[in-house]
């Protein structure tokens, strides 16, 4: 690999206003690139439209799916979304029909530390502010549907306790006998708000409801978000929502959304969410955005329907899995592929020189603090240490049976010596290719070499090999993944053990796992950097997502409601008199 890099002076100033300076095409002019007509679109303004899923055909030629993952994330960012968008642009420049599939950003990270998720520079989704803030309203619809079920639970609990046996006489409905201590369905909001992690509802008693302890989660953690991402049709979504276990009765029986009589109304609120949203990149190429489950506390992939639509309409679909290969990629194979049969042809692992050095574990990197000179300057020994993390992720991706291409997300001042070392290391570690990506600086022009490598790698695809069989016990599945992570043993709290036994007894032992853990380490301990070995994986809680079709395994102290830091992104966001939003990234 002999990279030719632009200087920062040549590139970066012209990118600062990319979002506002790019000439956007009407979305009706983007759709024909995928063979879509105006009749296939449900317009949302000039530059966004939902694609009616009636455009899906039951059979026909299928494109190839490229799954983008990364090394263990660092506060520096690896540029996975930039690479995903840039790679799709590069594929289009090579004369193929390419489309990217990404998740809808949550407002929590947008206003928190991470910021938006539109990509950046010359490889981003536009209009960026529409993507990052509301898009077509799917997350709000999910929040409304989720909170309707929560309100219905508390209302039924209140009325049954108030009326007793008279409730059935008045309503003709059976008593559910909801156990107030076994309500499993919290409320949600699409913000980071740590003050809502522990709350009391029904305070005041009497007509105010039944007082009980509860909590609020971020909408991206809602089972409804996972259901949207995994559904094959509106009918499938309705059936899945009906299977959600909301609570248990005083006799221990599961109470579902269908039992509560709220599943139909929830689905009605989410009706329009079933259609993926079409937007454009900074090079006026198509992007499909659909669903937004986090990869640390959920399964971390965009929707089955978006992928299916892309595979029907394009030669190559570039889809992104959240966080490192131990998170979103693992869940793609063991949950999304297992349920849908959608098969990637290649895995792309994104890394940067800086993040590899940070993964060495030598430095404690914190957001907003100056980087040590050793990370910014040429330092082959430090890079070599951090490359052990890359090797682990290459081997992890290869364990699923697919070819792996390493994409080096390049900075203008990256050392050619370090880039050459990294290319040699990646190939010796088992990657089929290693290529730089200058997507941020050059868009598709900076990714054509990478795109060709990826297209070539797709020719070597074979059926994926899953980490564990369906008929393994839940404990066996946990142990298999823990061993892959490098754990010495798995421990279970008494609560987790009881929950695991109950889930198995209820007939859900065949389901795949969704491990909720820190994304900042291959282990469940964020302080264990690089490639941890011989650690203990602590399972603290387990729960079944019967509608989504997986069992959630909480490893360590996992928060399903993030908090805001001391310097959240909202400090930098404002709007001018013409309505132009500034500071959103």
Swiss-Prot record:
The gene is fhs. ATP binds at residues 74-81. This is Formate--tetrahydrofolate ligase. It holds the Pfam family FTHFS. PROSITE patterns: FTHFS_2. Belongs to the formate--tetrahydrofolate ligase family. HAMAP family: FTHFS. Its EC number is 6.3.4.3. It catalyses: (6S)-5,6,7,8-tetrahydrofolate + formate + ATP = (6R)-10-formyltetrahydrofolate + ADP + phosphate. InterPro entries: Formate_THF_ligase (IPR000559), Formate_THF_ligase_CS (IPR020628), P-loop_NTPase (IPR027417). It is an enzyme of class 6 (ligase). It comes from Yersinia enterocolitica serotype O:8 / biotype 1B (strain NCTC 13174 / 8081). Pathway: One-carbon metabolism; tetrahydrofolate interconversion. The keyword Transferase does not apply. GO terms for biological process: tetrahydrofolate interconversion. Keywords: ATP-binding, Ligase, Nucleotide-binding, One-carbon metabolism. GO terms for molecular function: ATP binding; formate-tetrahydrofolate ligase activity.
